[in-house]
Amino acid sequence: KVLAPTNCGSGYQVVVRLQRRKRLAFDARTTLEKDERDLYWRLTRRVIPTLYRFKGNDRAIPIIEDVAVPPETLPDFLTTLQNIFKSHQITASVFSHAGHGQLHIRPFMDISNKTEMHKLHSLADAVYDEVLRLGGTISGEHGAGLSRTAFVRKQYGPLYDVFREVKRIFDPQNLFNPDKVVSNSTVPVDANLRPVSSQVAVTTNVDPPLPAAPASGESPPVVQLQVHWNENEFAFATRSCNGCGRCRSQSPSERMCPVFRLGTVEESSPRAKANLMRAVLTGSIDPHMLETEQLKGIADLCVNCHQCRLECPANVDIPKLMLEAKSQYVATNGLRPQQWLLGRIDLLSALGSRFSRAGNWALSNRQTRWLLEKLTGIAQGRKLPPFAAGNFLRVAHRRRLTRPSRAPGNKVALFLDVYANYNDTMLAEAVVAVLQHNGVSVYVPPDQVQSGMALLSMGAADRARKLAQRNVATLAEAVRQGYHVVTTEPSAALCLTHEYQNLLDDEDDKLVARNTSEICNYLLRLHQSGRLELDLRPINTTLGYHQPCHVRAINQGRAAENLLRLIPGLKVKSLQKGCSGMAGSWGIAKKNYRNSLRAGWGLISALREPDIQIGTTECTSCKMQMEQGTTKPTVHPSKLLALSYGLVPEFESLLSKRGQELITT
């Protein structure tokens, strides 16, 4: 593939250059589509970071990565290069711009192993000797930099003294980039590698400390881990970041990182958070700093959207690292009262649904909302979902849905979470109706509790673990009876399939994870297997679909969008405007309210377009944000399917319903 950036010259020059190169290629493809173009650029940018996905202690070290030799000597040079690696007993990755003889070479080495590090200088020496013998250069594209300073004299000989004199004239105090390109002393080739050796012992509540490598004879400090990590997984996660900076992207084709995009300061970036935890483990930062407000402030800049975990070329699990960091603080200091209330929103919702008239009046009244903000920290201006009159678990009990069936066939265990249970019982009604219409037996486990995502996002790992244990015990039994777990809430699906495995370590949580789906994905799989009823009535309207971050995080693609396109007459417009900016309890809080709106303004503005009548999304939090800046309703895809099937007569008013000032539809 040949990618031609806009700085290649005039259009005519680009065409001429491409025509000359085309005869050297086996095939060529012209792409004019934005998505395809972005794909090709992403492929070129991700080669190097992908090398850091390999498990184990060996890392791809960029010491000799930029050599160039005359193209005609490339075959012989590659043979010699392989022999050099063999003699040093080193494996390396090699990729190149073969047309002009440039190679990117990254040996895989354990930089915590001093014996291996001793090989580094002799390896570079041998490679550079061969490069210079062939008339090449040690830095063909990226400049000499720190890693090649020790070898610049070898390439330039007497001219090196001229370089030093120029440096002395313009920078007599050696303030700018000291020891880069030219140096007054011999700089070891590994002088600027980041420390990775653990100087801190880590332990769990039940395990003995994992060994560290203290510099002195003193006992190393011990960090008691709050999150479940496999052996050496924590250390590996902290050093997996290679510092490439892709997480600082502002590209509209990527989502990471919504908080960094608000204010492009380094501490907001996922990279900074990986460096923070690595510094703790290597002893550069006192582990007790994890218990301070200073480090908690940085950890709180992670809103647990999981987009960096998905889009990081090296797959660094920043959300899990930040869950550990937040949990360290909470384990020592506890939750603030306002955080506790937001984390146990199920208790507030249960109270609100029991007294729904009074609760909904309080939510829609400016004076009571002012008081609510003072007591709970929930932003006064944030539209909140109204309470239902009663909860769906009681409805399910009356309809005998809380009794498991032994009958064969497709069977679903419906996990409600908070919103479908206390705020929008009609959503649960819609899901049950759609599933039963398609011949699926529905069971609503009566012992289920909230998923605990809000608690996880705050770092209350112990409290979330208790909820996880209860849910896993209930749902695992349902799975063993032949049920597949389905939920309407993407955050709940993420908890069941991913987050609970960060809290628990047993076979049941893995069993539940393997057998859990978000409702739209489950229905789409029914359609793909030819088992979804297609007796859908037309809905003649245009809607804007937003894909939630947590739907992306569970790798379910665009199931809801594809399902909605089955409905006759329904025009689906994909609103690809990044994160909604809500991030669950983060966007509800007063202190984050304005930043939440800034992060989601692109989505809100897109929904205001006159050709869009309604919005749709799977996520409750995203729905709240989508209705924040408009009176247009945002409707769950399951409700639209139920409406199209003609299953719930009350849904006829869905498309014309309008939100209120402080309450969502």
Where are these regions (language model features)?
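Terminal amphipathic helices with adjacent charged low-complexity linkers/tails
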Residues: 1-58, 62, 91, 96, ...
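Glycine- and acidic
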Residues: 1-2, 58-69, 104-112, 145-149, ...
